Design a protein with these regions (language model features):
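Flexible coil/turn and secondary-structure edge motifs
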Residues: 1-183
Length: 183
């Protein structure tokens, strides 16, 4: 792996949605779906969905900061999910679907906190941002069938109804960040 890469860990609802969007961002080398922010070691999808672990569904984004900035990644994050709803994204309800930024260093923490302050001041949403900003303790990779889920299952009903609109929104509003033009 490129030693100049940095890592971002984000939670904003179902990890399939975030992974599908971040896979399309230039400067992103890989995206992995997983779990973070909880108290159980090596959680399973079933345990996370039952709400027994404290973990959120997250993605880890490995990116080249010379191509795309951490702030740009966060701008996309705030645009493609609702950061004002506690423990919920659409029909997905539970702490595993919370909005969270798990920072890897103090610089990421500052960028996240400053951006949240800026976005709240702009009154973009009717309610304040509830996104948790916390240090990353551990990241646990999700099961293989969750990796690249949207790319492998674009016609699955959830993907068509929930993931595809987020990908379309990203393509429409962040054209300058696209790796390539959509077909």
């Amino acid at each position: 792996m490129n030693t100049n890469l940095q890592t971002a860990t984000l939670a904003g609802g179902c990890f399939w949605c975030l992974e599908a969007v971040y896979d399309e961002i230039k400067g992103v080398h890989s995206v992995e779906s997983g779990y973070a922010g909880g108290h159980m070691d090596n959680p399973t999808y079933r345990a996370v969905c039952n709400g027994d672990t404290g973990h959120a569904e997250v993605i880890q984004v490995h990116f080249d900061p010379n191509v795309v900035s951490y702030r740009d990644l966060l701008n996309v994050f705030f645009a493609i999910h609702d950061p004002t709803t506690l423990n919920r994204q659409g029909a997905d309800v539970g702490t595993q679907y919370r909005s969270a930024i798990f920072y890897h260093d103090e610089a990421q923490k500052k960028i996240a906190e400053d951006l949240i302050k800026d976005l709240n001041a702009q009154n973009i949403w009717d309610k304040p941002i509830v996104t948790e900003v916390a240090p990353l303790d551990n990241f646990y990779m999700a099961e293989d069938y969750h990796q690249e889920y949207y790319a492998r299952n674009p016609y699955q009903p959830y993907c068509m109804a929930v993931v595809a609109p987020k990908v379309s929104k990203f393509r429409k509003h962040f054209l300058e960040l696209l790796k390539k033009q959509p077909v």
